[in-house]
């Protein structure tokens, strides 16, 4: 009887705390948020209202001709949700095959992205190492906007296939140009002045601006530099922003050999 009374009092106490806003922060709550799983197909129209982009609007996300093109029209929140889904999908397979689980997939931090973009060339202006935008044959080395209103001199008007142009020395394609990329990091114009060199990442839940790197097909050369920074709001999708995922890879020395 005493135990039953104690349980009843405990239940009543919890109900009272749930009704009382002043004590509500003491209770464990699960925060849920609904996120669209499909790209925003209207970004081609919304980003460029006076341009004839109906073919991209109608076909980019569905026609087989675009199956090797980078995904765009994805907000930062959607990109993070995809990383979580990919982790769950991969580890479900690992469990089924009795294999060890992998670390979480995620967006790269701003510092990780720049390290990868440099491709082992610390002083490089662009991912290919040189300060020039043309190769020795006079061909552009990335998909961007060479001049005001000129989108076609690099043989690409919009985004192109993900493995277009040459990769950097880490064998990564289009680290500059084609589509810009979300990073995990929150944007602060003065972040480099006070972040730790051991963990150079700004990740603030209250900061809605997220760092975007790499430049895109609609950007001038300045944004293609591996040191250039830009941002977009985390709930905004664009026709020129995509993403790539990373995760910490663990392996034994035997596997490395």
For each predicted feature, which ranges?
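Short proline/glycine-enriched turn/loop segments at secondary-structure junctions
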Residues: 200-204, 230-237
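Single conserved hydrophobic/aromatic residue that forms the stacking wall/gate
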Residues: 1-7, 11-13, 251-257
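A short catalytic or substrate-binding loop motif that flags glycine-/basic-rich loops and adjacent residues
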Residues: 154, 237-239
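Small-molecule pocket liners
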Residues: 7, 124, 243
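Long, internal stretches of domain cores in catalytic or enzyme-like folds
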Residues: 17-18
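Functional-site microenvironments in short loops/helix caps that host divalent-cation chemistry
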Residues: 22-226
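Short, structured beta-strand segments at or near domain termini in extracellular proteins/domains
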Residues: 239-250
């Amino acid at each position: 009887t005493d135990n039953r009374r104690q349980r009843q009092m405990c239940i009543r106490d919890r109900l009272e705390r749930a009704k009382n806003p002043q004590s509500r922060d003491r209770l464990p709550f699960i925060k849920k948020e609904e996120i669209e799983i499909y790209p925003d197909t209207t970004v081609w129209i919304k980003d460029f209202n006076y341009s004839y982009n109906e073919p991209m609007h109608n076909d980019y996300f569905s026609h087989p001709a675009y199956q090797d093109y980078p995904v765009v029209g994805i907000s930062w929140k959607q990109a993070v949700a995809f990383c979580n889904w990919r982790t769950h999908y991969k580890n479900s397979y690992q469990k089924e095959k009795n294999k060890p689980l992998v670390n979480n997939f995620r967006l790269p931090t701003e510092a990780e992205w720049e390290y990868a973009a440099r491709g082992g060339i610390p002083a490089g202006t662009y991912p290919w190492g040189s300060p020039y935008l043309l190769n020795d044959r006079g061909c552009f080395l990335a998909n961007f906007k060479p001049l005001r209103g000129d989108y076609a001199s690099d043989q690409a008007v919009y985004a192109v296939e993900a493995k277009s142009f040459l990769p950097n020395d880490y064998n990564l394609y289009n680290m500059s140009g084609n589509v810009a990329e979300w990073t995990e990091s929150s944007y602060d114009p003065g972040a480099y002045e006070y972040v730790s060199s051991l963990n150079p990442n700004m990740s603030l839940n209250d900061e809605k601006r997220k760092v975007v790197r790499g430049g895109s097909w609609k950007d001038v050369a300045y944004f293609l530099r591996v040191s250039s920074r830009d941002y977009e709001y985390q709930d905004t999708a664009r026709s020129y922003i995509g993403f790539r995922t990373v995760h910490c890879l663990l392996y034994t020395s035997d596997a490395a050999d």
